Amino acid sequence: MAEKRNIFLIGPMGAGKSTIGRHLAEQLHMEFFDSDHEIERRSGADIGWVFDVEGEEGFRIREEKVIGDLSEQQGIVLATGGGAIKSRETRNKLSARGIVVYLETTIEKQLARTQRDKRRPLLQTEEPPREVLERLAQERNALYEEVADFVIQTDDQSAKVVANQIVKLIGM
């Protein structure tokens, strides 16, 4: 039997990477990982604490290591953090080690999906959330597109429907 390829989900916070990833892994009988949860597991601290103590740079170093380690496995679905693609090394590893699916969403949907979530350090600032999300989109959207094998709009679809679309797109 051929080895199952890895599937890496990228995109902004609130795009549905973790929820869609769980559905996708279940459907394909693959193991699911969320890079943020793995960082928390390995560090013994939540993402907010890592950001507070080590700053975004310290968090990104941890994220790069976790994604590097996880992407060496075979047959996994990995939901990455929204900023993971900022690292060229991470982008290269994702491209080389699996199928990269960019889950695209609008700022409006991101706001609706993240407004009550206190576990998103980049939104816990004085800057209004809309401005933060718009700035992040400007910084990151081209990087998502650069590394993506496929792009799927998640706005008005359930996680299960998006997971089904991914299965059809990648032919697994």
Curated annotation (Swiss-Prot):
Binding site for substrate: D36, R60, G82, R140
The name this protein goes by in its record: Shikimate kinase
Gene label: aroK
Cofactor or coenzyme needed: Mg(2+)
Documented EC number(s): 2.7.1.71
Ligand binding (ATP): G14, A15, G16, K17, S18, T19, R120, Q157
Catalysed reactions, semicolon-separated: shikimate + ATP = 3-phosphoshikimate + ADP + H(+)
Keywords: Amino-acid biosynthesis, Aromatic amino acid biosynthesis, ATP-binding, Cytoplasm, Kinase, Magnesium, Metal-binding, Nucleotide-binding, Transferase
Stated role: Catalyzes the specific phosphorylation of the 3-hydroxyl group of shikimic acid using ATP as a cosubstrate.
GO molecular function: ATP binding; magnesium ion binding; shikimate kinase activity
Location of the protein in the cell: Cytoplasm
Annotated family: Belongs to the shikimate kinase family.
